[in-house]
């Protein structure tokens, strides 16, 4: 549950740090609301419990806690302006020794937006419409290495240079659409020349069933590499070969459903197709995900299976299929969610074996 507080303290601090004249010039206000929200999440995980290939790093702590701030105020009738900034996962980063800055504010959804009964517009860093559905409900519990970021990955996830519109509900129907330009690693803020994408999703709910569909298309620019100079073993300067850059046209789509079944059961399934085409080679791969769950009061059981099928390059099948079978037992105790998850990840290495992933954790949303 979001906790609300008036921005009087923040406004006062800004006013004290400024002259009275400057405060008036920048328009410091103290009459809008700020929501503070987040997730406290800690788990103990081993990604290779059976130590296949002598490749287990043992059990480690994963801190997936995050926090966000959302300020909002009605600018005029039926037009509410919202600013949100949200951190990434804290992880167990050693900041002093070059740790990845995933826990910084602005790493997750961070935007300026406006909303009313006409819908919601967000400008900044948000999920793409397709990835929103890929992520939930079809990548949980623990299916992301296959259905989310696994495979040839011809879709984006969260992008910075993006404008997204979400419609209101028209009966049981709603949709979202976005355009963007970002193509940096990890969705960084600097766009690449000629890189762009657009996407959309749609949902239709009736009775206890929701149908979902999404599509995304874009152009990724892969830069030229090589051409640098180095000394060979005789001390002679030689130039490394130049590998030409290229543009990858991307395309991805998803169709799926969620169903709430009698007696506490639920079922969700989706099929996803992806394609990369640079004009010289065409790389295609299909994936699917099936998730079932059962709830009896505060106790829940969730079982999921996701797989990437063998991809094809110019119609030739590749030997790169993999899959995950995952099960999770969880409870809800006064808002806290303790859980145990065991997953079998198969064919993710050249040995074509199965790694057993075990995780025990606790989460609490606020």
UniProtKB/Swiss-Prot annotation:
Swiss-Prot/TrEMBL GO biological process terms: monoatomic ion transmembrane transport; polysaccharide transport
Superkingdom of the organism of origin: Bacteria
A GO CC term attached to the entry: cell outer membrane
Subcellular location field: Cell outer membrane
A Pfam family this chain is assigned to: Porin_4
UniProt xrefs under SUPFAM superfamilies: Porins (SSF56935)
Ranges that cross the membrane: none
Keyword vocabulary terms for this entry: Cell outer membrane, Ion transport, Membrane, Polysaccharide transport, Porin, Signal, Sugar transport, Transmembrane, Transmembrane beta strand, Transport
Keyword flag Transport: yes
Claim: Signal is one of the keywords in the record: yes
Function summary: Involved in the uptake of chitosugars.
The name this protein goes by in its record: Chitoporin
Organism, as annotated: Vibrio furnissii
């Amino acid at each position: 549950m979001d906790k609300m507080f008036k921005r009087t303290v923040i406004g006062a601090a800004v006013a004290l740090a400024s002259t009275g004249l400057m405060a008036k010039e920048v328009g410091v206000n103290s009459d809008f609301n700020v929501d503070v929200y987040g997730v406290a999440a800690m788990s103990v995980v081993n990604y290779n419990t059976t130590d296949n290939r002598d490749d287990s790093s043992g059990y480690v702590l994963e801190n997936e806690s995050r926090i966000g701030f959302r300020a909002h105020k009605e600018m005029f009738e039926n037009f509410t302006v919202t600013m949100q900034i949200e951190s990434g996962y804290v992880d167990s980063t050693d900041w002093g020794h070059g740790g990845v800055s995933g826990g910084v504010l602005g790493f997750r959804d961070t935007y300026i937006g406006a909303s009313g009964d006409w819908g919601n517009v967000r400008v900044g860093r948000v999920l793409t419409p397709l990835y929103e559905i890929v992520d939930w409900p079809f990548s949980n519990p623990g299916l992301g290495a296959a259905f989310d970021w696994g495979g040839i990955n011809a879709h984006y996830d969260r992008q910075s240079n993006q404008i997204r519109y979400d419609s209101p509900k028209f009966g049981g129907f709603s949709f979202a659409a976005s355009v963007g330009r970002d193509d940096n690693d990890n969705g960084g803020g600097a766009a690449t020349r000629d890189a762009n994408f657009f996407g959309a999703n749609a949902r239709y709910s009736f009775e206890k069933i929701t149908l979902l569909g999404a599509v995304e298309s874009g152009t990724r620019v892969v830069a030229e590499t090589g051409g640098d100079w180095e000394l060979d073993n005789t001390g002679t300067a030689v130039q490394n070969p130049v590998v030409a850059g290229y543009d990858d046209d991307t395309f991805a789509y998803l169709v799926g459903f969620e169903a709430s079944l009698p007696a506490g059961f639920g079922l969700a399934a989706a099929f996803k197709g992806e394609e990369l085409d640079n004009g010289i080679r065409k790389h295609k791969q299909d994936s699917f995900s099936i998730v079932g769950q059962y709830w009896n009061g505060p106790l829940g059981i969730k079982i999921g299976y996701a797989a990437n099928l063998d991809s094809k390059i110019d119609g030739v099948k590749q030997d790169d299929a993999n899959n995950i079978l995952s099960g999770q037992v969880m409870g809800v105790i006064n808002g806290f969610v303790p859980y145990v998850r065991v997953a079998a990840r198969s064919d993710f290495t050249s040995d074509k074996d199965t790694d057993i992933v075990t995780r025990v954790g606790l989460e609490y949303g606020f």
